[in-house]
A protein has these predicted regions:
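Bacterial N-terminal signal peptides that target proteins for export
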Residues: 2-12
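Residue-level hotspots at or immediately adjacent to binding/recognition sites across diverse folds
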Residues: 23-327
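Bacterial N-terminal signal peptides
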Residues: 10-21
């Protein structure tokens, strides 16, 4: 009887341990897998900028003055005349009607009808422009080559130069609230503001990487991405940055350039880059997991209008939709 009791206890203990390990393995495994699908853009342009106002209405811009627009979540894209053949690098819309595109040679265009027509905006620079950000309908910034920062306080009617203190190309700008924001660029350049963009202060990144993009999950937690896999994190609004660059791995010859980063909430973030790479975090950047990508062409633009759907675009007119789902 004693031997039978011991046997039952041993089996029960083994089952408990097995269930414990099974539960641990399930908890440790990623819970969510994205569905990534190709969309037909009808264009061969290299697409560098993308913005979705909502899950139906979006725009993409790129080489040869290309502007594409969708009103049905990317099922169909139509080409819109931009009035220029300049390379367009970024697009931003304040609402469903008012928007801007920027690009090479100081190109700035604005639309008041949802991107159907575009008019010229004259600025005081011929430098290439790469980034757009507005903190209110009246107050916004453009950033670009040679340390260019342009500011508007009248809704984009007029743009004035601001001192950046650098000659490095500035590629991306983000405002986390009406007082704080960050700019990133070449040669490890990171600038921050704490006075509503009246002035910009250089921060030490301890890197010579070219940063292509910056995004914040909230007012203090942000990420910058760049060439050769550069991945940097701040937890204090941009004053200090920590190198979180992912290891290359045994079969890796060169770290992939990371070109765009977006966070849809405090936990969930996305990165796209060279060779169609898509990375995702569901734990605030503690881990980044590579998602299966249907393309090998570089992805250079990324937009998430909602936590449940996003789009990326890149070389050869590539556009993909990204829809999170359960594993």
């Amino acid at each position: 009887m004693r031997r039978r009791t011991l046997h039952i206890l041993a089996v029960a203990s083994w089952l408990f341990i097995a269930l414990l390990y099974a539960g641990t393995a399930e908890a440790a495994s990623p819970e969510i897998r994205a569905t990534v699908a190709m969309q037909k853009s009808g264009s061969e342009a290299t697409l560098l900028g993308m913005f979705f106002h909502d899950p139906q209405l979006g725009w993409a811009v790129g080489s040869g003055g290309t502007i594409l627009k969708t009103t049905d979540g990317g099922r169909k894209w139509k080409k819109v005349s931009s009035g220029t053949t300049s390379l367009l690098t970024a697009v931003y819309f304040q609402d469903a009607r008012r928007g801007w595109v920027v690009g090479a040679n100081g190109t700035v265009r604005t639309s008041r009808d949802g991107g159907e027509t575009w008019s010229v905006v004259f600025v005081s620079t011929q430098a290439p422009l790469y980034g757009i950000a507005f903190v209110t309908p009246q107050k916004g910034w453009l950033v670009g080559g040679n340390g260019t920062i342009l500011q508007t306080t009248d809704g984009g009617e007029n743009w004035t130069d601001q001192a950046s203190g650098t000659s490095a190309a500035l590629h991306s700008i983000v405002l986390t609230n009406q007082q704080h924001g960050a700019i990133v660029g070449a040669l490890g350049t990171i600038l921050t503001t704490s006075d509503g963009g009246a002035s910009w202060t250089p921060q030490v990144s301890q890197s010579s990487a070219t940063f292509f993009d910056v995004a914040f999950a909230d007012e203090v937690n942000g990420w910058a991405v760049g060439n050769a896999g550069a991945l940097f994190q701040t937890t204090d609004g941009g004053t200090h940055w920590i190198d979180r660059t992912l290891p290359c791995g045994r079969t890796c010859n060169k770290l992939t350039d990371l070109i765009r980063v977006r966070f849809t909430d405090a936990q969930q973030g996305w990165i796209v880059g060279e060779h169609g790479q898509i990375l995702r975090t569901t734990d605030a950047g503690f881990n980044w997991v590579e998602e299966a990508s249907p393309v090998k062409r570089s992805l250079m633009a990324l937009s998430f209008p909602h936590t449940t759907v996003g789009w990326a675009a890149g070389e050869g007119g590539t556009i993909i939709s990204i829809s999170p789902g359960r594993r």
